[in-house]
């Protein structure tokens, strides 16, 4: 039964997603896309681009996946898996590609000759979104499952890229510094301080970042996570004060 409707749903979602992405690249996301392509982008730019990719994917799925068109008005797991997974894999491809371009060109400018690692298979992260959408019988609940969780997962795709490349560089003897900046807009704008995020704010060694969950984020979190490969002539003497000492 599901096989009869899912191919058309997938086609519609992917078509809408690509349409959204062309608009992102040509309009609101143009400066980000071309800054990356021209080698002028920062990690903050790629993070913002990942956010746009998430919004493009979220919009495409919400436009097409209507419970009125599904058997029994229900988002059965089989349908969720067959429709959500393909577009989110495409989202991962967009983010990972641009992330690699930015890091490679940033390394070149700094004279660093280090290999770039593509982020690991995103199946586990995508499965979490499928879990939230599966079984929904309310359009509002389904749309909610396809909004913040999808956008946050797109950002996590980039977080994973940064984390895995930091781990690689650390294994090669480079000193990696993780910086997390609190988002005072977005989900947190005008609301109470998010203590969960504030606990992870600041500058961390890579080891401490892993221990304290600095690479993690909740749905709707727009905190900026950056990873820097330290210059060999710099040494951080006190991680708790976030102060640098130049040698």
Language model segments and positions:
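Domain-core detector
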Residues: 1-218, 226-247
